[in-house]
Structure formats: C-alpha cells, structure tokens
Amino acid sequence: MDSPSNSIQNLQQEAQGSSSAQLADHDHDRVSMAMPLQTDQSVSVSQSSDNLRRSRRVPKPRTSIYDEYEEELKERANKPKRKRPAPPKKKAPSTQNSKSNDKVEKKKTTSIAKDGKPTLKTNDKKVAPKPKPAHEQVEPALIPSNWTSVIPLLTSDFKNQYSVISRLKNPNMKPVPYAGDIIKLMAFINKFSSFFHSDLQNLSFQDFEVGLDLYPGDPNGSAAGIVKGPEDTSLLLYPDFMAIKDIVYCQDKMNLLFLSLLDLTFTENFDGKSAKKKGPLTTWENLKSSSKKVFSNPLYRLRLVAREWGYPREWRQQLPSDQDISKPKTALFEQDEQTPVVDPSHPEILTPNIYTWNANEPLPLESNPLYNREMDKNGILALKPMDRVVLLRALTDWCASHSSAIHDEIYKLTHGKKDPVFGIQTQQVPRYTIEGVDNTINQFKKLCSLIQSRYEIRSKKKHFVKQLKEGKKPDLSRKLEILKEIKAELKNAVKSEKDELLFSLYDKWVPLFEGELPDQPLANPFSERLYKLRLQEFFLGRVPHIGDFYMPRLHSYGDSLEMSTFTDLRNLQALLSKFKNNEYNAFTLFENDGQSMSAQFKLFYHDTPSLAHDVARGRNTSGKVYWYELCHDSATLLEFLEFLDYKIVKPQDEKKEGNEKEKEALNNEAHILEQKSTTDNNPSINTNPLPKDAKYNTARKKLQILKEFLSDYYFILRQFEQMKVQFADMKPGKRQLRRIQRQTVNYNTEYDSEEYVDDEEDDEADIYDDNDNDSSFDDGRVKRQRT
C-alpha cells in the first residue's frame, strides 16, 4: 500500500499531466488554424523530404509520359497473355411475374458427392428448361425450267467438240447438200399448215426429191441419179423404177406449193381464221384453171420487189476468192489529191476520189433464173433442179418476212400470256429426244414426290388448316383429296409395281401440277402454242462429238389426227407398243386418217459441230456438205440399227492378268481379223467402235438411246409404207368398202348365169361410183368418167 504522501504526489502529477494535455490540444488547434497562412507564404517546402504536399505555386516539372510508364509497359509486355474468358451465358428473359430487383435470388448451393459429381440439395427445386419454338417445315422449291416438256437446243454444246464423218461411214450414207433447204420448207408447211391445201400437209422428203428431180449424192460426191447397188454402180432415174403417174403427181404438188407460196406472199386481208372457215387460199382448181395468168401475175409482182427484198446467194455474182473485198475495185483518179490544205478545219475544198467497191450484184437478166419466161407457163418445173430448191427456199424467206397473213400468225404465237421459263431460245426440242424415255419418266417421278411433299407440308400449316376448316380453300381441298386417293392406291401396291402404277395415275397427277408449275416433263409439247414457232419437230437426238439426227415427216399439228406420232411420251409409247405387238396394222392407220401424215421417211445426220466451228471462224460454208442420208426406208433402217451396234460397244481393256489375258488376247486377235476381213470385203462401212476415251462414254449412251427409240419406231414406219402401197388412191375414212363387206352366199347351184353376170356388173358399177366419190383425184387434177 502506498503511503499518503506518495498518493498525494501521484494525484498532483496526474493533474499537471491533464492540464499540460489540455494546453497541448489548445496549441494544436492554434497550429492547425495557422498552417494555411504559413504554407501560402513559404514556397520552398518539398513533399519528398517533409512528406508535405507541394504548393500550388510551385510548377510541376515536365516529364515524359514514356519515362513514367516505361517500367510498367515492360512488365505488361513480359507478362503472359491471359486466356480469353468464356462468354457469359444468356440470362433467361424476365417475365412480368418475376421478383423485384431489390430481392436478390439465393444461389443454389450444391454439395459434392463421393463420386465427385455435384448434386442438388433436397430443398432445391428443379427448373425444367423452356421448350424451343417449333420451326415450320419449308416447302421444297421447284425451278420451272427443270421440269418442262421442251428443252432448248444450244449450239454451244459443240463448242469444244469436233466430229469425224468417217465414223458413220456405211453403204447407205450419202451426202445430200439440199437436205437443209427441204427440211426448212417442210417445217414452214408444218407450222403454218392452215394456209396450205391438205394434199401438201402430208408431203414426204421423197415427194420433194421426185417432184423437183433431185437425187442424193453417192459417197464419192453428187450424182445425177440413184446408185443401183454396191456392186452395180449404174445410175437409175426416177422413171426407171417409178410409175409415170406418181412422178407427175409429185410434180403437180410442187407447182401447187409454188403457187401457194406466191399467193400467200402477196395476199391481203387473209389470216388463220379465214383459212379455217373458207379453206386454203390456193387449191387444185386454181392450178388447173384455163387462165394463162396463173403464174404470170404473181411472178410479175415478185420480179419487181425481188431486188429490194434480196436475192439468194446462189443467184448473185460470185466474187473471186483471191480478191480482197476490203479494198476498192476501181478509182476515178489514179492518185488522191495531196495539195496542202490552207484551212485544216475545211478539208472538203479538195476534190475527193470516187471509188467503186465490190458488190454481190444479182445475175444479169439473161442468166437470172427468176426472169425465165417459161415459168409463166410451166411454173417451177421450168427451172433447173437446184434452182427449183433455191427459189422455194427464197420464197419461204420472203413469205415469212413480207406476208401479212404469216405476220399475224407469228404475232399470235409470240405474244401469248406467258413466256418460256428458260427464255427465248432459237431452237427447242422435246425433252424425251434429248434425255431419253427412261430419264424423262424418272424426272416425272421426282416431280411427283416433290409435289406430294409440298401439299403435305402445306396442309399442316396453321393458316391453311384454319382456311380449310372455314371452307375458304376449295381448290386446295380438292387437290388434297386427289392426293389422298393416289397415296391409298400406292400404299396397297407391291413395291415392284409402284413405278408402273405411278405412271398409270398420270391423269390424277395433272390437276396437282396446276398452279405449281407451268409445264411438266410428260406434257405434250406439240399441243402448246408457246413452243410451236421454235420447236424442231423433226429432231430425233443429239450425240456428243458426232452431231444431230433428224427424220422429217409431216404433219405435227392437227386436231383430227388420231394416230399421230407427234404427241406426248405416254401416248407415243402406247401407240408404238400396239404396232410392235401387231395390234394395229396398215388398215388401222388408213381408217384413222393415217394418210394425213407422211407415208415415207428418211433419216438424216447433220454435222452440227463442223458447221458451228466454220461459222464461228468466219469460213465460207457455200459448197460444203453438212447433211448426210443414213436410211430411206424400213429395210435400210434395220441395217442402220445393226451398224449402231459397232459404235455402242465399248473397246475392251488391254490390261488382263494371267491366262485370261492370253485367252482374251487370242479372242481379240480373232475379232480384229474378222473386222479386217469384213472391212476389206466391204470398204464402204466403218465397223470400228468409238474411241476408248472416257469423254466418249456419253456419246455411247446417247447412241443407245437413239437405237432404242428407232427400234420401237421401226414397226409403225413399216406399216406406213404398206399403207401407201395398199391404199394409195383411196380417201381415208372408217367406212368399209363394198368389196370387203360380208355378203350373203347363194348356195343354190341352179342359177341363171346371165342374171349372175348382170348382178355382178351392177355391183362393179356401185363400187366404181364409190371410188369416184372417195378418189383423191376429184379436186381438179384427174376426174374419172363412167363408161
């Protein structure tokens, strides 16, 4: 225990300490109040030494920013790059019932199980993910140009291809330089058939040759006759193997065609409607009239305008081949005036030289075929054979350019409500002639599956379902019912028979195509006016590295044709199969207006690659032959089909192994020896196959398609030839003749012979009357008289 004296001393010290502390606090307050005055007056205070702040009056020394941050920049450069953080997950969209922002949602705590996988606690609730909105199925797109019944025929297909004529060398192959002109005439008659007489609508290529006295050339060049055979090279003229009346009939047809073209060129106020009502403008009566001005009047008008319209190339003065047409022919002055011009801005004060340039002027009047005065009496037969073809071709061009009736018809064909989906192309051909029958049918099947999926997807869409329930889509409802019937029939069919059944349900598929596509692969290309003007009706096929094939036959367009080969693929196949199975014959053709079509045919090969390259390079094509005859009747057609077998077969590969290689080598040698023997015996045929290069594989396929098509075509062509022989002078119709009608038989042997003879004569007279009524020569050409 402290003593009282010590405690008193301690109390006194505490009191002094507290008083000194109060004085210190009081002094501190005074210092703090006086500090600002002191800092304002002193300017030498340093913050680094005294840890005091710098005076505002002291300027801050200028330092480089790079110096200040140099070390920091070095540290950042040496520091390794951080990995890019993963993008944050998107938050679920907030809803109206979500909690307010001031309430923070508690995070779900997870506990780690023994296996290391996080598990939710028992009090946590599982949140089911929201279902994604279902996307509507999109209807498959349909490109109209891929599903048309007609395909454009482009010359650019042969841009990098070259043909070799000798590959198709066979005994029946003949150069025909006039084939292109006659095919052009036949195409003009075919497209504007309403302006021509019915006897001109079934002309065959042979009718033109006989009527114009033209002969196809032999393999060595043009000839003035037809070669009798490979062994006998003597030439035959048409009177040597044809009846004179048939030759005269063909010549009369050519004069009728010539007069029809003349009248059609200069006629006015005549169109297709008046031709259907009143008939053709020119008939046999006009040709056989006693007037001497049948040809003279239209020929007089033609001679006046021919120079303005333009003469054909063959009737113009030909320029010498060694003459440069870019240089003038003659000059009025020997040298041009070279006096310097005083005023260069007016050089016309000098006398210019007058030049005469080369021009393809028409032939002189004495050698111009158009001014042949014999044409006023004999028509086109007054000219030479090749001049006849040239004049008919020129008349076709003049008629198409200046005839008002043809202009009106062309305007109707080119100004329809719709245009071709593939654009305006110069030439168009049916799809099955390019792609073949099987590929065209497969295209139709693909289209059916696409159309079915489009309707099925459409029927499930909400707005369509609503409209169907309200009855606002009757057309769609009807199509869905048709589709339902088709699916029911296909469902019950066997898998192997589905393709045939799908093909047989064509009539039910057609309404489903309406409104979806303007055309479809199996439609009839000859019934659509949209394609009529540019359609190549005589086209048969195109083979790469070889060329095109044509079979000119009339006529393609007509409402009365019941057995026409110019129809859609379905009807054509059905017709060809019936002739192939002998269900139809020549008499069936005769009953169903078979004589309104060409009874004869010729198959031609067109060297399109050579023509395309010659035209592109600016070469002169006159005098060159691009058309070749391959067959002219059903017998030579069979020979051509056998010839195609040599070209379709692919050469065997030389790489063989072991004994098979030796055996096949021996077989190949034997086969080569056989080929050499055949070619040696018959050098006019080339039996070598196409080259083994892979680029010729497409050519082999196309030749196979052409062979199959011609093989089916053979049977109907043979019946047409038989019909021409059996029913040459008879008018077609379904009325049976008296001689083939079934008559009652008299079994009584006791009859008066004189009575029988009288009855027989009466029957013959009746038959004669019928033949007079049915004869095709009762229209001003030849008339029979009863005796």
Curated annotation (Swiss-Prot):
It comes from the Eukaryota. The keyword Transmembrane helix does not apply. Residues 751-777 have a biased composition (Acidic residues). GO terms for biological process: chromatin remodeling; regulation of DNA-templated transcription; sister chromatid cohesion. Residues 1-22, 675-689 have a biased composition (Polar residues). One of its GO terms (cellular component) is Isw1a complex. InterPro entries: WHIM1_dom. Residues 40-50 have a biased composition (Low complexity). It holds the Pfam family WHIM1. Residues 79-92 have a biased composition (Basic residues). Residues 100-137, 778-787 have a biased composition (Basic and acidic residues). Residues 1-137, 672-693, 749-787 are annotated as: Disordered. It is found in: Nucleus. Keywords: Nucleus, Transcription, Transcription regulation. Functions as a component of the ISW1A complex, which acts in remodeling the chromatin by catalyzing an ATP-dependent alteration in the structure of nucleosomal DNA. The ISW1A complex represses gene expression at initiation through specific positioning of a promoter proximal dinucleosome. Component of the ISW1A complex, which at least consists of ISW1 and IOC3. Present with 1770 molecules/cell in log phase SD medium. This is ISWI one complex protein 3. The gene is IOC3.
